[in-house]
Structure formats: C-alpha cells, structure tokens
UniProtKB/Swiss-Prot annotation:
The keyword Transmembrane does not apply. Pfam families: Ribosomal_S2. Keywords: Ribonucleoprotein, Ribosomal protein. One of its GO terms (cellular component) is cytosolic small ribosomal subunit. This is Small ribosomal subunit protein uS2. HAMAP family: Ribosomal_uS2_B. GO terms for molecular function: structural constituent of ribosome. InterPro entries: Ribosomal_uS2, Ribosomal_uS2_bac/mit/plastid, Ribosomal_uS2_CS, Ribosomal_uS2_flav_dom_sf. PROSITE patterns: RIBOSOMAL_S2_1 (PS00962). Belongs to the universal ribosomal protein uS2 family. Residues 254-277 are annotated as: Disordered. The lineage of its organism: Bacteria, Bacillati, Actinomycetota, Actinomycetes, Mycobacteriales. GO terms for biological process: translation.
C-alpha cells in the first residue's frame, strides 16, 4: 500500500513551488514545469523520495532512534506539535535556540531546571516566598516551557531531524550537519538540496502540504515503534534483530500511534538573548 497517494499530494498543493524568480538552480532536477510564473514540482519524484524517507525513519526508530520534528513557521507549528506528540517524539515549533544540538549539555541543564520549577510549583515549593520571587520563578518557568517544552523528554541528541522549511530552520540544519545527524526535509524550489540527506520535493509554505508530509513522517515513526516493540506487520512474527528496550511511555503510545493512518482526503542557551532561526 502506498504511503501517500498522488491525489493527496495534489489536494494539499504539494506540487506548487515558488515564483520562477525565487528559486535555487540546484532544484532544477525536481521541477516538472512552470505555470503562470510558478514552478510546478514533479510529484512522481516526490512519491519516490517519500518512500525513501519513510523507510529511513521507520528503520531509525525501530533501532531505538529518536526523530526531532522542527517547524517554527506558522504554517507548520500546529502539525509539527500534534504529530510529534502523537508518536511521542520531541519537537521545536516556537523558536530554535542556537546550540540546541551542538551544545546539548546546556540544553539538558535547562530542561532539568524546567522540571525543577514545575515540581516546586506543584508541591508547594513557592510557599513562603515573596510575591516578587514567585513572579520571577513563574516567568522563568513559562519562558523555559515556551522555548523547550517540546523537547522536555529528549535525553540525548536525536538520531535524525524532520524539518519544514530548511531556509527558515537553517540554524537547526547547520547544527545537525555539523554533528552528522541526518536531515529529512521538505524541499521547496528555493531550497538547497545539498543540505538535506533525505529530501522530499514539495511545498513547504502551504499548511495542508506541511501537515500531510509531517503526518507521513509521524506515521513512519509509529510503524518503527511497532517494530521496536517486537511486532512485524502482517505475519505477527517477532523481530529477531536486537533493539533497545522500549520505554514504558512508548509502550503506551503503541496502541494509539499504530492505529493512526493518513486520511484519503548561533547563540548560547542561557535565558537571555536566545537566537531565533
């Protein structure tokens, strides 16, 4: 069964690129034609690259890998958060802080601080403090939640990242490449394919296109989680290859994530002055 259909891609506007005057010549091989000054992306290639990306993500997760979903533009924020949450993966949909990957030790400390503040708030740790102190702690917690809430359970550098709009997320892409973390991304006609390991030629500006392709990647994660749990679709035989033990929170996700399917229709990480992509 196809991961996604041509009709779904057409209905979501995945084939629409940018104006012909706004393009990257390296994308020429992915362009089918131009119409009324707009490049039309070759969806046959899109389907082929979707299959490659899907298999890579599934295999990565099956072997215990983690996929970080990144999309901070308005068109992608909702779907990135929803789909990553559906399959228990970390995400960044508000802003990318410079050093989030390359300086992960600092990120981890800030995540610990966030959890500490949340625990204080829930267990009465704010009691006995002045209103000014409580206000300061609350603001600190809210700021950390906005910046790092989507990766609160990310204990290590991800095995791969999914990116909506590599131009906007150039800092994230640069950090991933520096660390050798594979990049899976939508490639619009103004993007540089050399920056991406698993490209999916498509429209990264349309909400429906970003949502559809993000859902595809999340579904690949869900299937990878099933394999990791020792399931093999169709024959019910256990997976013989050794994989990392499945955490309890991922076991809880399996029933919901596995049954979901596509519908046919650089700065530091201190609290001050975060870098926004």
């Amino acid at each position: 069964m196809a991961v996604v259909t041509m009709k779904q891609l057409l209905d979501s506007g995945t084939h629409f690129g940018h104006q012909t005057r706004r393009w990257n010549p390296k994308m020429k091989r992915f362009i089918f034609t131009d119409r009324n000054g707009i490049y039309i992306i070759d969806l046959q290639q899109t389907l082929t690259f979707i299959d490659k990306a899907y298999e890579f993500v599934k295999e990565t997760v099956a072997r215990g890998g983690l996929v970080l979903f990144v999309g901070t533009k308005k068109q992608a924020q909702e779907s990135v958060a929803a789909e990553a949450t559906r399959v228990g993966m970390p995400y960044v949909n508000q802003r990318w802080l410079g050093g989030m990957l390359t300086n992960f030790s600092t990120v981890h400390k800030r995540l610990q601080r966030l959890k500490e503040l949340e625990a204080m708030e829930q267990t009465g740790g704010f009691e006995g403090r002045t209103k000014k102190e409580i206000l300061g702690l609350t603001r600190e917690k809210n700021k950390l939640e906005r910046s790092l809430g989507g990766i609160r359970d990310m204990a290590k550098v991800p095995s791969a990242i999914w990116v909506v709009d590599t131009n906007k997320e150039h800092i994230a892409v640069g950090e991933a490449r520096k660390l050798g973390v594979p990049v899976i991304a939508i490639l619009d006609t103004n993007c540089d394919p050399d920056e991406v390991d698993y490209p999916i030629p498509g429209n990264d500006d349309a909400i429906r296109s970003a949502e559809l392709l993000t859902t595809v990647i999340a579904s690949a994660v869900a299937e990878g989680l099933q394999v990791r749990a020792g399931l093999r679709c169709g024959d019910g035989k256990p997976e013989t290859e050794a994989v990392e033990p499945l955490p309890e929170w991922e076991q809880e996700l399996l029933a919901g994530a596995g049954s979901s399917a596509l519908n046919d229709s650089g700065a530091d990480l201190s609290e001050a002055n975060p870098t926004e992509a």
